UniProtKB/Swiss-Prot annotation:
Keywords: ATP-binding, DNA damage, DNA repair, DNA-binding, Nucleotide-binding. The lineage of its organism: Bacteria, Pseudomonadati, Bacteroidota, Bacteroidia, Bacteroidales. This protein is involved in the repair of mismatches in DNA. It is possible that it carries out the mismatch recognition step. This protein has a weak ATPase activity. One of its GO terms (biological process) is mismatch repair. ATP binds at G608, P609, N610, M611, A612, G613, K614, S615. Pfam families: MutS_I, MutS_II, MutS_III, MutS_IV, MutS_V. GO terms for cellular component: cytosol. It comes from Bacteroides fragilis (strain YCH46). PANTHER family: DNA MISMATCH REPAIR PROTEIN MSH1, MITOCHONDRIAL, DNA MISMATCH REPAIR PROTEIN MUTS FAMILY MEMBER. It comes from the Bacteria. This is DNA mismatch repair protein MutS. The gene is mutS. Belongs to the DNA mismatch repair MutS family. NCBIfam families: mutS1, PRK05399.1.
């Protein structure tokens, strides 16, 4: 048996193999050590010939659904090796084979999957001129592809968040250099990533002559990535994939660009703080699993075209204004369940009888939804109603053939209703009317023998038998055969009982075979409805999301935004959708107005003390814009949203010191990416840029960036720039579309009260020392800090730092270039040369410290 194990293990050496032995799944050798640690099961040893032993750990086969998810979540690939024949029918070693390879990206097990999110497998192909990418969720059948530069593929990887990524063997350095090392990855042989093999695989799967019908024919690199995914499904023994019915192109030009920094800093999907909330958490009132998954997708793919946005808003408004319609849809959605994943299980042959019944219930619930949508005074709802397919024939067949409360597994029996098959009914009559028949035999034999206490019973050793107490054993007929002697009784069998037993047991076996055949035929018939039911699932998910928007709007007092094809962003009394939900009971969120356009107020510089709410104001502006462009109502009194095509944020950078990048380097990298990609329709948020360097460096860089955005000849991006550099307020005097605002505070009796209201004009104070006092800083330190602050302010006034030089900078911005080194001292020249030749981007922290030590030695003359 161990040879059999080793032969099968050699096919997938990197996977943990669950080896079926009777009623247990066993693991051996290093697999056993891994399984014991992850699953918390006992690690033992078994003899392995010639005095050797091998590690072993196992669990009962019925506990697979409990233990398999734990292995997958631990990032393991799991090969399930089952017995391919009944041990009772063979005297040789039981034939075994790998029936499924479950990986983080390839699973249809409900216990592995999260019902609120997709479980995507991705493949990346590094082409000569572009990078191809494909995504597949085998649990839903969604199959998508795209190609483009590395930054676009990086954005897709972060927005789709695949559980596993495939790429060509030997390309790990290229992958991690462009996309990082946070993903679970797997390398495949180079032949998998060839155009000929991929195209052939796709054409064979879709049974087409070309891929033009999918709109991906021109995506050479995307086709290669897509084909690699299908090859991987074969390798993992997932060959029944009839639910993968199309390959769709991810249309980049339809969606707002959100990079990974923006998704993270705006906390769209998850919070950056433990226990914090996200925008998704606030607006997700979906009912169905499909709706929850689609909403998560919408969050990171906002629309940028006016018509589809208004189509969504029209439906949300209809829900909002029609409470009876809303309640009807809500009630029916609660009955539908995970229609999308159930129909996928039909294709792969893993659908249970209970799931088939749930599918029937879902189809029944769709009927009133379809009727209501078709009758609604709303074109978008009418179109949804038209696309919903009642699948009446299969729905009625399920109703006719499957019991309403069947067992979970077909081999438990009792799945098929009475009256479906004559032979099945007859067999059931034989098998399940046994009690009456046995009672008649018992009564007859008792009367014939005169033994009143005679009884007929059954056990697995002797089958049916007659039990007679010792008091009456002299009355037993000679034709009875004694099988067992007990202390107070004897047990006998008769020819009649033996024949009846064979008849009953044969009937039970035949019932199971017949029920399985009838059920399989039904599932095969159901598979013909996969495309129609997938469309149903998509439309139900869409309705669910829009209903969720309406319920959130009603609950939180949101209004419908006005979507306009211009450059004006005019939000009146806007609120932060997440923060307002976290306020203590009775506390009201302080709403604010924000106006940005390309004519008079393109850039707003926001100053104000720490903790005043500058960052919240920036984020709320972006979140309101994003909510509007996914088709949701927004938290404001009114909102005119001039369509945005990109949202950029530079809000808070976490040090990446492990790869040699400081806070400042991260800031500059992110700022550079923004400035190289802005357009006239972009919304740009900068929060406290330049904190990671010296004050004057920070002011200079911040000034230059704001000036660049304002003076850009083509892309006048709408920008909010929050800063503690009050010197930037000088820019309003020299740049006509820059305006100063501040988040107001009030100082009473040497205490600061945060009013959190955006007001016109700059701010002169940061109140940092007041914040330190509020944080519980020792009084002696606060006192000393005030003394130092007064001295510094006095010195600056005397030296004229705050005003004149910056005004001169704005006047001489044409051809000014700073000279960093104007030195004559040879030692300083040597230091200059050392610094200028440093490759800062690739310098690690340890190397930086060593270089600093070298410079120190130069200064000391050593």
């Amino acid at each position: 048996m161990m040879k059999q194990f080793l032969d099968l293990k050699a096919k997938h050496p990197d996977a943990v193999m669950l080896f079926r032995c009777g009623d247990f799944y066993e693991t051996y050798s290093t697999d056993a050590i891994i399984a014991a640690e992850i699953l918390g099961i006992t690690l033992t040893k078994r003899a392995n010939g010639k005095g050797k032993t091998v590690e072993m750990a196992g669990f009962p086969h019925h506990a697979l659904d409990t233990y398999l998810p734990k292995l997958i979540r631990a990032g393991k690939r799991v090969a399930i090796c089952d017995q391919l024949e009944d041990p009772k029918t063979t005297k040789k070693l039981v034939k075994r084979g790998i029936t499924e390879l479950v990986t983080p990206g390839v699973s249809i097990n409900d216990n592995v999957l999260n019902y609120k999110e997709n479980n995507f497998l991705a493949a990346v192909h590094f082409g000569k001129s572009a990078c191809g990418i494909a995504f597949l969720d085998i649990s839903t059948g969604e199959f998508l592809t795209a190609e483009g530069p590395f930054d676009y593929v990086d954005k897709l990887l972060n927005n789709f968040a695949p559980k596993e990524i495939l790429f060509e063997r030997g390309k790990r350095g290229m992958f991690e250099g462009n996309f990082g090392s946070k993903f679970f990855t797997f390398e495949l042989d180079d032949w998998v990533f060839t155009e000929s093999s991929s195209r052939e695989k796709l054409l064979k799967h879709f049974e087409t002559k070309n891929l033009k019908g999918f709109g991906v024919e021109h995506l050479k690199n995307g086709i290669i990535a897509s084909g690699a995914i299908l090859q991987y499904l074969d390798m993992t023994e997932h060959t029944q994939v009839g639910h993968i019915t199309s390959l769709a192109r991810i249309e980049e030009d339809k969606y707002v660009r959100l990079d990974k920094f923006t998704v993270r800093s705006l906390e769209l999907i998850g919070s950056m703080n433990d226990g914090g909330s996200s925008l998704l958490h606030v607006i997700d009132k979906t009912i169905s699993p499909m709706g929850a998954r689609l909403l998560k997708r919408w969050m990171v793919f906002p629309l940028k075209d006016e018509k589809p946005i208004n189509d969504r808003l029209n439906v949300v408004e209809y829900f909002f204004r029609k409470p009876d319609f809303r309640e009807l849809i809500e009630d029916e959605l609660h009955r539908i369940g995970d229609l999308e994943r159930i129909i996928s299980k039909v294709a792969v042959g893993r659908v249970s009888p209970r799931e088939v019944v749930q599918l029937k219930v879902a189809l029944q619930a769709i009927e009133p939804i379809k009727e209501a949508c078709q009758q609604a005074d709303n074109p978008s709802l009418n179109r949804i109603g038209e696309q919903l397919n009642l699948c009446i024939s299969i729905r009625d067949r399920i109703e006719k053939e499957i019991n309403n409360d069947p067992p979970l597994l077909i081999n438990k029996g009792g799945v098929i209703k009475d009256g479906v098959d004559t032979e099945l009914d007859e067999l059931r009559q034989i098998a399940y009317s046994g009690k009456d028949y046995l009672l008649k035999i018992q009564q007859r034999e008792s009367e014939l023998t005169g033994i009143p206490s005679l009884k007929i019973a059954y056990n697995s050793v002797f089958g049916y038998y007659i039990e007679v107490r010792n008091v009456h054993k002299d009355k037993v007929p000679q034709e009875w055969i004694r099988k067992q002697t007990l202390v107070n009784a004897e047990r006998y069998i008769t020819q009649e009982l033996k024949e009846y037993e064979e008849k009953i047991l044969g009937a039970e076996d035949k019932i199971l075979v017949l029920e399985t055949r009838l059920y399989t035929e039904l599932v095969q018939a159901l598979s013909e409805f996969i495309p129609a039911i997938q469309i149903n699932a998509n439309q139900i998910a869409r309705i669910d999301c829009l209903l969720s928007f309406a319920n959130v709007a009603k609950e939180n007092n949101y209004i419908r935004p006005v979507i306009e094809d211009n450059d004006v962003l005019d939000i009146r009394q806007g609120r932060h959708p997440v923060i307002e939900k976290q306020l203590p009971i009775g506390e009201k969120y302080i709403a604010n107005d924000v106006l940005l356009d390309n004519a008079t107020q393109q850039v707003i510089i926001i100053t104000g003390p720490n903790m005043a709410g500058k960052s919240a104001l920036l984020r709320q502006t972006a979140l309101i814009t994003l909510l509007a462009q996914i088709g949701s109502f927004v938290p404001a009194e009114s909102a005119h949203i001039g369509l945005v095509d990109k949202i950029f944020t530079r809000v808070g950078a976490s040090d990446n010191i492990s790869v040699g990048e400081s806070t400042f380097m991260v800031e500059m990298n992110e700022a550079s990416d923004i400035l190289n990609n802005i357009s006239s329709r972009s919304l740009v948020l900068f929060d406290e840029l330049g904190r990671g360097t010296s004050t004057y460096d920070g002011i200079s860089i911040a000034w230059a960036i704001v000036e660049y955005i304002h003076e850009h000849p083509k892309a006048k991006a709408r920008t909010l720039f929050a800063t503690h550099y009050h010197e930037l307020n000088e820019m309003e005097k020299s740049f006509k579309r820059i305006k100063n605002y501040n988040v107001s505070v009030k100082e009473v009796d040497n205490k600061v009260i945060f009013l959190r209201k955006l007001e016109r004009g700059g701010s002169e104070h940061s109140f940092g020392i007041h914040v330190a006092k509020m944080a519980g800083m020792p009084k002696s330190i606060v006192k000393r800090a005030n003394e130092i602050l007064k001295q510094l302010e006095s010195d600056n006034r005397q030296q004229g730092i705050s005003g004149k030089p910056l005004a001169e900078v704005s006047e001489n911005r044409g051809g000014m270039q700073l000279s960093f080194f104007q030195l004559d001292d040879p030692i300083l020249c040597q230091i200059r040369d050392e610094i200028l030749h440093l490759d800062v981007n690739n310098l690690t922290p340890i190397e930086a410290l060593n270089k600093l030590n070298d410079i120190k030695k130069i200064v000391r003359g050593k």
